Each structure stands twice: as C-alpha cells, then as structure tokens.
Amino acid sequence: MRIALTNDDGIQAPGLRAIYKALIEAGHTVDVVAPVTEQSAVGHAVTIAMPLRVKVFHENGFRGHGVYGTPTDCMKLGLSSLLEHKPELVVSGINAGANVGPDILYSGTVSAATEAAHMGYRAVALSYDSFRPEDISAHARHAAALLPHIEWAGLPERCVVNINYPAVPVESIKGVRVCPQTRAVWHDWYEHRTDPRGGSYWWLNGVIPPESVAPGTDRALLTEGYITVTPLRFDFTDSETLTRLASLEE
C-alpha cells in the first residue's frame, strides 16, 4: 500500500521515524511530507502570509519532504504538488501525547488527517499517551499491523480514524476498543512567571478532572490500558438545535 505520512511534532520526531520504519518493514511504500519544526497544538492553521519552503531529508534509509509550515500546509502542499503518486492512505503521527476528547480541536496531528480526509483521502491519526522520550518501536509495529484491518468500504466519506495507544508496553495492552470521545473539558490556568531579565510571561497549564470523564469514552479506556479507536467527522452543526433557532428565519 502507498502511504503518505505526516505529523505535527516535526519530521525528525521519534514517533514519525518509528512508524515510518514499521510501515516500510511491513512492505508499504511511504512518502513523507511533515513539518520541519515542532507544530504541536497549531490546530488546522494554514500559512497564507508567507511562502512555503521545502527541505528534502535523506539520511540513514529515511527520505522525506520537510515543509516550513503547519501540518495542514504539509497535506495541502504535499497531496496537491509534492508527491508524484496519490496515496491509498494518509497516516498522521505517531504523536507524542494522546489526542482524545477536546484535544482534537487543538491537535495538528488530527488536523493533518482531517485535511487529507477533506481532500478525499482515507486518513488515520496515531497518538501515544506520553510526552516522555520512550522507545515506541513496538507500538509502531502494532499500529502498522492494525491499519490494514480498517474496513474503509463501510465508512462514510471524509471520516478520520483517530487511534490512541496507552503508555504501557505492547504486551500489557488490554485490547482495542472502538469508542466515542469524552466530553470532559480542560480546566486551564496560566502561571505568571518572571524571566531572568525581570520580564513577565505566562505559561499555560491545565488538567481534565478524572471525575468528569465518562466511562467507556476514549480518555477513560486509554487510561485503563486499551487502544482507543474513534471515528471522527468534522461537521460542527448542532442538528438538535437547528429547529429551535428556526424562529429567527424571516
């Protein structure tokens, strides 16, 4: 299978290199178009005020296009202009840190997959529930083996399959669960600090209270040690409220 690979952690990130190696070893052809720099939490941002520049990375058996832009830039430019062949599947990841519940609104990883889906490609987002530097080569091999089992023929157009791996050894994973997103939200705050020169700055912090996470949702099952699989469709229309607002029509 020909696969286009991207991420938001950057083209040199361990997660991308791990899944690249695993996909190649599984017999796939992999074309990489990923950001040159760290782009976590940029969401679906697109570069419009400056040109996009591309750097080719070719080292130790790895080859890919590095884009000085966002994950969405990578997909728009890569799928329309850089890649010689259309992929059969787009994979975004493996991200350092889970993308569950409200995380998908901020995630460059999920946004890259979403952009690919909107362009008519089958797309998967892969994430690992830890920010610590860890060897996730076994998880990458597991993911490479899991992807061919997705039954795309039965899925609607522009669907993104969002897959998250728990931060446990592969042999300790309890299984795979297809589940909805949690509706729990982040409780954010900013820490006010002072730099060595006396200047003020603010640092974002936050937590999702565990008691607000409903059982059977992606965050709950991921914490329990399951791989979570959640299909995403980016239609933000609140269909239930449409009729309630009908009185505004003239």
UniProtKB/Swiss-Prot annotation:
Its EC number is 3.1.3.5. The keyword Cytoplasm applies. Binds 1 divalent metal cation per subunit. It is an enzyme of class 3 (hydrolase). It is found in: Cytoplasm. It catalyses: a ribonucleoside 5'-phosphate + H2O = a ribonucleoside + phosphate. A divalent metal cation binds at D8, D9, S40, N95. The keyword Lyase does not apply. It comes from the Bacteria. InterPro entries: SurE, SurE-like_Pase/nucleotidase, SurE-like_sf. Keywords: Cytoplasm, Hydrolase, Metal-binding, Nucleotide-binding. GO terms for cellular component: cytoplasm. Its cofactor is a divalent metal cation. It holds the Pfam family SurE. Disulfide bonds: none annotated. Belongs to the SurE nucleotidase family. Nucleotidase that shows phosphatase activity on nucleoside 5'-monophosphates. This is 5'-nucleotidase SurE. It comes from Nitratidesulfovibrio vulgaris (strain DP4).
